[in-house]
Swiss-Prot record:
The gene is nuoA. Belongs to the complex I subunit 3 family. NDH-1 shuttles electrons from NADH, via FMN and iron-sulfur (Fe-S) centers, to quinones in the respiratory chain. The immediate electron acceptor for the enzyme in this species is believed to be a menaquinone. Couples the redox reaction to proton translocation (for every two electrons transferred, four hydrogen ions are translocated across the cytoplasmic membrane), and thus conserves the redox energy in a proton gradient. It is found in: Cell membrane. Its main location: membrane. It catalyses: a quinone + NADH + 5 H(+)(in) = a quinol + NAD(+) + 4 H(+)(out). NDH-1 is composed of 14 different subunits. Subunits NuoA, H, J, K, L, M, N constitute the membrane sector of the complex. This is NADH-quinone oxidoreductase subunit A. It is an enzyme of class 7 (translocase). One of its GO terms (molecular function) is quinone binding. One of its GO terms (cellular component) is NADH dehydrogenase complex. The chain crosses the membrane at residues 5-25, 61-81, 90-110. Gene3D superfamilies: NADH:ubiquinone/plastoquinone oxidoreductase, chain 3. It comes from Heliobacterium modesticaldum (strain ATCC 51547 / Ice1).
Length: 118
């Protein structure tokens, strides 16, 4: 029974160990010399005038979030479209329900004004 889970266990272990190992190696190899120049903001080689920090509009984040949500739709639609002829009626109904949920989500985002630039 344990042999069945060996492959997924190895992938899980590798997925956890490799990022931590990469961060550890990066931390060990980094340079640690701090100076005043490194702390200054760089803007075309000129000294900045005024406040360099501006408030970031949340509209960009909202557009990105909506884009990712509907981009995932294409990831699921592509394999279904490739095997469309071999799939039965159940798969067609299932995809219809999936697309309906996404259309309702798109309609809700539109209704709430998430797609309007303010």
């Amino acid at each position: 029974m344990l042999k069945e889970y060996l492959g997924i266990s190895l992938f899980l272990a590798a997925g956890l160990i490799i990022p931590f190992l990469a961060f550890a190696v990066s931390r060990l190899l980094q340079t640690r010399k701090n100076s005043l120049v490194k702390g200054e903001p760089y803007e075309c080689g000129m000294e900045t005038i005024g406040d360099t920090w501006i408030q970031f509009k949340s509209n960009y984040f909202l557009y990105a979030l909506v884009f990712v949500a509907f981009d995932v739709e294409t990831v699921f639609l592509y394999p279904w479209a490739v095997k469309f002829q071999q799939l039965g009626t159940f798969a067609i109904v299932e995809m219809f329900i999936f697309i309906t949920i996404l259309v309702v989500g798109f309609w809700y985002a539109w209704k709430e004004g998430a797609l309007e630039w303010k």
